[in-house]
């Protein structure tokens, strides 16, 4: 009996350790484009719904209200932003692969800086 219980607990831990963290609805990962592809011509995606994939570079340490995908471009990293409390991204997500579906919008910068782009997601999946 004890061996069976331990086996069930071990199996549960293995499956839980590899489970993705999902915010919002399920994501169609087959439609995902790499964040670098979006950043080649971000204006062409403005106000459109897209699904992107990338590695998480950083996460908001105060309220978990944004995270940034690593991007090898002049515009990177690329920010994923939600209203405070809508989704709370865990600090442990840093370095993991993620997928996000949402609308690309302008992100106003300072007076002497060009505006950047960010994604307002309806769904996010932190995969590994």
Question: Could you tell me what each predicted segment is?
Answer:
Residues 4-13:
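Sec-dependent N-terminal signal peptides
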Residues 18-128:
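OB-fold and OB-like single-stranded nucleic-acid-recognition modules
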């Amino acid at each position: 009996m004890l061996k069976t219980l331990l086996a069930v607990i071990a199996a549960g831990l293995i499956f839980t350790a590899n489970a993705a963290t999902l915010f919002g609805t399920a994501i169609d990962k087959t439609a995902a484009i790499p964040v670098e592809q979006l950043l080649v011509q971000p204006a062409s995606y403005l106000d459109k719904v897209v699904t992107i994939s990338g590695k998480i570079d950083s996460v908001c340490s105060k309220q978990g209200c944004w995270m940034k995908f690593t991007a090898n471009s002049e515009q990177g990293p690329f920010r994923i932003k939600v209203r405070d409390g809508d989704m709370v991204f865990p600090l442990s997500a840093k370095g993991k692969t993620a997928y996000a579906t949402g609308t690309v919008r302008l992100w106003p910068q300072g007076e002497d800086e060009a505006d950047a782009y960010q994604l307002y997601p309806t769904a996010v999946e932190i995969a590994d």
